[in-house]
């Protein structure tokens, strides 16, 4: 409704459809007034953006998975070359928290990670979105469910992402945006 101008009190917006790491980067460069971001990325631009109260994504049972084309023990992950969907994604943060000794990390757009694993370009990859449901069809095996690991370790839902807005829009404009998102 917001994007299509259906809400009369809402400001006009221009839709930008990109993967989450691209959106994180655009926020880092302050290119957008309102943007969906990874919670992990928010710390990189919190001086310029504030997190809105609406539109956040906290999940249970829907976190990133690490998968491989061969059986890998989770404890051996730090010796592998691992694809991540961007350095500022929550998925990247979770795999680094799980395997802090992991050093061989390759950034690959999320929709190409399974192909990179199948082609042997990486040993494993952190997958997000619908990939977590389709990876068995690609002959891949789960190494670890990072969402399940996070939830069992912390007892908290996975902090996936939220909507951020530029602070320099001013209080009135930010309240208007917040109200439109709630509607």
How does the language model describe each region?
Residues 1-57, 68, 75-81:
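N-terminal hydrophobic or amphipathic helices and topogenic motifs
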Residues 1-9, 17, 62-123, 130:
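Bilobed "Venus flytrap"/periplasmic-binding protein-like clamshell domains
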Residues 7-8, 44-46, 95, 134-138:
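Short loop/helix-cap segments at secondary-structure boundaries that form the rim of catalytic
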Residues 12-14, 50, 103-106, 141-142:
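Conserved beta-strand segments of alpha/beta enzyme cores
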Residues 27, 36, 107, 125-127:
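A structural signal for short, well-ordered beta-strand segments and their strand-loop junctions
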Residues 27, 95, 177:
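A residue-level signal for conserved active-site and pocket-lining positions in enzyme catalytic cores
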Residues 51-74, 151-168:
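Hydrophobic/proline-rich hinge and linker segments of small-molecule sensing/allosteric domains
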Residues 109-183:
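Pocket-lining segment of extracytoplasmic ligand-binding domains
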């Amino acid at each position: 409704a917001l994007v299509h101008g259906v809400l009369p009190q809402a400001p006009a917006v221009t839709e930008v459809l990109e993967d989450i790491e691209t959106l994180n980067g655009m926020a880092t460069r302050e290119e957008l007034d309102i943007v969906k971001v990874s919670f992990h990325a928010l710390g990189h631009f919190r001086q310029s953006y504030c997190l809105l109260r609406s539109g956040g994504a906290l999940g249970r049972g829907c976190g990133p998975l690490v998968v491989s084309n061969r059986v890998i023990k989770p404890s051996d992950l730090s010796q592998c070359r691992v694809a991540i969907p961007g350095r500022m994604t929550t998925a990247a943060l979770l795999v680094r928290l799980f395997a802090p000794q992991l050093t061989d990390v390759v950034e690959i757009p999320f929709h190409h990670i399974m192909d990179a694993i199948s082609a042997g370009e990486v040993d494993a990859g952190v997958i997000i979105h619908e990939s977590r449901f389709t990876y068995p069809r690609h002959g891949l095996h789960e190494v670890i469910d990072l969402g399940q690991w996070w939830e069992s370790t912390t007892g908290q839902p996975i902090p996936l992402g939220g909507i951020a807005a530029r602070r320099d829009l001013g209080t009135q404009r930010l309240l208007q945006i917040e109200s439109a998102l709630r509607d």
